[in-house]
Each structure stands twice: as C-alpha cells, then as structure tokens.
C-alpha cells in the first residue's frame, strides 16, 4: 500500500517537472 501512493506521487512529480521544463524552454 505504501508503494502505491509513492508511485502515484512520483508520477505527479515527473509531470510537474515536465511542465517546468517547457516553461524554461
């Protein structure tokens, strides 16, 4: 169960990072 929320959080972080990169471009 702990890995479940951890995987979801990691996915959200990756998505946010992608948006940040586009803004920097």
Curated annotation (Swiss-Prot):
Key word Cytoplasm present = yes
Which biological processes are named by the entry's GO terms? translation
Q: Where in the cell is it found?
A: Cytoplasm
**GO cellular component terms attached to this protein's record:** cytoplasm; ribonucleoprotein complex; ribosome
Q: What GO terms are given for molecular function?
A: structural constituent of ribosome
Disulfide cysteine pairs (residue numbers): none
Report residue spans for region: Disordered.
Answer: 1-25
Q: Which UniProt keywords apply?
A: Cytoplasm, Ribonucleoprotein, Ribosomal protein
Q: Which InterPro entries match?
A: Ribosomal_eS32
The record's similarity note reads:
Belongs to the eukaryotic ribosomal protein eS32 family.
Further facts: Initially thought to be part of the large ribosomal subunit. Crystal structures show eS32/eL41 to be a small ribosomal subunit forming a bridge at the interface of the 2 subunits.
Q: Tell me the function of this protein.
A: Component of the small ribosomal subunit. The ribosome is a large ribonucleoprotein complex responsible for the synthesis of proteins in the cell.
- Oligomeric and partner information: Component of the small ribosomal subunit.
- Name of this protein: Small ribosomal subunit protein eS32
Record the organism: Ictalurus punctatus
């Amino acid at each position: 169960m702990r890995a479940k929320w951890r995987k979801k959080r990691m996915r959200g972080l990756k998505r946010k990072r992608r948006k940040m990169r586009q803004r920097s471009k």
